[in-house]
């Protein structure tokens, strides 16, 4: 696993808005990934959680998969033609075929699910603590736990994860 970078390494810079895209106001975004020319979004809220794709020109959302009403959707990751979505407190991850939306698998895991990303081989999951878990995508079994620290102190409440240039970024 790559080194995990604390806030002393955060890039602080100015920015400019290059484009504004419409977005459904009712979508409670929990996971976001741009892949294969489409913006994928995992949303939360009990009874309303979905995985959807968004048309950047119109903001139109196309529901790809709907979670059971009792599940609160969280982070998503696309890997090997599959979409993985965590749930917050249901201890479940869903795996869908990225072309058809068919549910392929359902995995159980301990604790909460918050953020999810991939390096193209493994999955990396946060659970709201200072830990990031390396997961086997075929079994969803934890292979490694990495505790993120900053100046010797644990950095709790890690949420959304992104894999960028060999590093995991978290908010």
Give the ranges of each region predicted by the language model.
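Single conserved hydrophobic/aromatic residue that forms the stacking wall/gate
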Residues: 1-11
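A short helix->beta-strand "capping" segment at the edge of beta-propeller domains
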Residues: 12-26, 56-61
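Beta-strand-rich domains and repeat architectures in extracellular enzymes and scaffolds
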Residues: 18-50, 65-77
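Surface loop/turn motifs at the tips and blade-to-blade linkers of beta-strand repeat domains
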Residues: 20-25, 64-69, 105-111, 146-153
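Short coil/turn segments that connect the beta-strands within blades of beta-propeller domains
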Residues: 36-37, 80-81, 120-121, 165-166
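Conserved beta-strand positions in repeat-built beta-propeller and related beta-rich domains
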Residues: 41-46, 83-90, 123-129, 170-171
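Short loop/turn segments that connect beta-strands within beta-propeller blades
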Residues: 54-59, 97-101, 136-140
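Blade-loop segments of beta-propeller domains
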Residues: 59-95, 101-113
